[in-house]
């Protein structure tokens, strides 16, 4: 079901989970965002499979994720080389990751990565930005049991 403009529709995307920001220097970015947001990061975590160290800030119901590459050829390093530091992805929380992937693939959207384990106790998948108005969209769900 595709809602019309002006209609209220509480669909499968539960909320904006976080904004992912690619940074060249995690320590400096943490200092800046601690000043700007008025809170310290609640978690720093390395995701070896992705070649990245993440740092999370809680901002109300949503989060900010800072991402620094641990390898010169990792996805975040390539992103910074091509586009510079800044917004990397927008993540939406879903209840059923595999179900949402199936629904979106059925509508012609391409998954370029996942489903797989990600940071902050989540299972994640990414949609191809060519299909999503040039925005890298992450779907994430809480890891189950």
Sequence positions of predicted segments:
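N-terminal beta-strand motif that seeds the catalytic metal site of vicinal oxygen chelate
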Residues: 7-30, 85-94, 142-145
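Short secondary-structure junctions
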Residues: 38-46, 108-115
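Regulatory and interaction patches adjacent to catalytic/ligand-binding sites
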Residues: 79-80
């Amino acid at each position: 079901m595709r809602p019309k403009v002006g209609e209220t529709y509480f669909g499968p995307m539960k909320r904006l989970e976080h904004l992912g920001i690619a940074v060249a220097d995690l320590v400096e970015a943490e200092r800046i965002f601690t000043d700007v947001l008025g809170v310290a990061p609640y978690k720093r975590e390395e995701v070896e499979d992705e070649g990245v160290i993440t740092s999370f800030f809680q901002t109300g119901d949503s989060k900010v994720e800072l991402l620094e590459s641990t390898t010169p050829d990792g996805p975040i390093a390539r992103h910074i080389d091509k586009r510079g530091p800044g917004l990397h992805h927008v993540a939406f929380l879903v209840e059923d990751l595999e179900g949402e992937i199936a629904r979106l693939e059925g509508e012609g959207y391409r998954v370029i990565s996942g489903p797989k384990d990600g940071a902050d106790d989540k299972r994640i998948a990414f949609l191809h930005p060519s299909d999503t108005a040039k925005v890298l969209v992450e779907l994430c769900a809480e890891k189950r049991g």
